[in-house]
Amino acid sequence: MLKQIAKFFYNLLPLKKYLFFLVRKLFLPTQNLYQHLTFKGIFKVPVGNKKIKIFHTGTILENQLFWKGLEGYEPNSLKIWLKLSEMSNIIFDLGANNGIYSLLAKSKNPASTVHAFEPVERIYKLLKKNVSINDFDITCHNKAISNTDGMGFFFDDDEEITTSVNVNMSLSEAASYKGVDEETLHRVETEIITLDTFIKEGNIPKIDLMKIDVELHEPEVFDGFAENLKKFKPVLIIEIIRDYVGASLHEKLSGLGYNYFFINEPYGGVDHPIKGEAYQKVDTLTGGRYGNYLFCSNDIVDELKLV
């Protein structure tokens, strides 16, 4: 109750945005402090000699970007994503959230075609807002990529901005995954479509680069991509947070000429050790090392000098 009261009065404070802009110019607070210094409004993130605009809703993702720029959120993933975007013509962002990956791709390669998919309607609206304030030509889709076409569902909470929903996962599984009581979740219907169907209906000639962050639904995504995966063989960045997902992806991608790299983010802790190369070549996708992985051909390995 005290925490809620404090948050209520904090939200009433005027001019927080401008105060934090001033603080950021003078010094960088510790993470323990700045994680509490949030506001609502537009801010800019430097991307090379350009800047992109992000609408801050108060999430950790946006706060990290505000205080530390691209070094604050998945820096090694974003760094290689920018390089890959520059080399890619058609880019897909599955589980786009606020659109940071899509925005960076378009900023780095304005001539590229970018498709962003986000099934949660209020997050989709935020995605659209970020695309609009940057005046970017990014095609946004309020649907989920899955293994069938039609309607699916997910269990959502009442948080203004949610960071994870699990398509077609049971209520008990969703509650366990989110670490909340079942009573706090409600069922939401959403349109689902396979990549193969989307490619056919949209006359998509190829996919060069794809980011997939769909909260354990990755195997179903690839089940619906079987027809075109072998033909397109896109470069992939995929979040793997369970061994069974890694094992399934290894089975589906083996024999297609992909190299696997664990993207080692500098956050410390068990899953993301501070020491080590940023992109570590691995032979397996299991073993409890969770985070983002890069999947690419020998040509990409050579061009980016990954080994």
Predicted feature residues:
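S-adenosyl-L-methionine
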Residues: M1-V120, K125-I193, ...
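Residues that form or immediately flank small-molecule/cofactor binding pockets and catalytic motifs
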Residues: T59, I145, E159, T197, ...
